[in-house]
Curated annotation (Swiss-Prot):
Phylogenetic placement of the source organism: Bacteria, Bacillati, Bacillota, Clostridia, Eubacteriales
GO cellular component, one term: cytoplasm
Protein name: 3-hydroxyacyl-[acyl-carrier-protein] dehydratase FabZ
Enzyme class: lyase
Keyword Metal-binding: no
GO terms classed as biological process: fatty acid biosynthetic process; lipid A biosynthetic process
Keywords per UniProt: Cytoplasm, Lipid A biosynthesis, Lipid biosynthesis, Lipid metabolism, Lyase
Places the protein is found: Cytoplasm
């Protein structure tokens, strides 16, 4: 388990773009389960959409990428490195994420070679899948 403070030591993201609140399960280099508490005060809800607030899909994908990044950022070889997107594959959006939801972020590292990591990711609310797919990211010197 990682606290928000420990997450901020691993990721360079800060409010309003840090989208992982805590890590509840971590197998370094293999798997992570994290949580994003979706507040009605999120700045993106002002415009997406004021009368029917929905968390933008691209931000769900970003939250998944941040969670997956934590799974490899904790490895000694990646200390001080920055994870940057290299690809999004077969991402499907199945349910909406709204204010008050607790978004569970899961990432399983499939392969990591030549500095590029591929992960299977899933975001869910109360056991219902909101989004799932595969992402790729590269760990680079910051």
């Amino acid at each position: 388990m990682l606290t928000n403070k420990e997450i901020r030591e691993l990721l360079p993201h800060r409010y309003p773009f840090l989208l992982v609140d805590k890590v509840i399960e971590l197998e370094p280099g293999k798997k992570v389960v994290a949580v994003k508490n979706v507040s009605a005060n999120e700045p993106f809800f002002q415009g997406h959409f004021p009368e029917y607030p929905i968390m933008p899909g691209v931000l769900i994908v970003e939250a998944l990428a941040q969670a997956a990044g934590i799974a490899v950022a904790v490895l000694e070889d990646n200390k001080g490195k920055l994870g940057v997107f290299a690809g999004i594959e077969a991402m499907k959006f199945k349910n909406q994420v709204m204010p008050g939801d607790v978004l569970t972020l899961e990432a399983e590292i499939l392969v990591s070679k030549l500095g590029v990591t591929k992960a299977k990711v899933k975001a869910s609310v109360d056991g219902k899948v909101a989004a799932e797919g595969e992402i790729k990211f590269a760990m680079t010197k910051a």
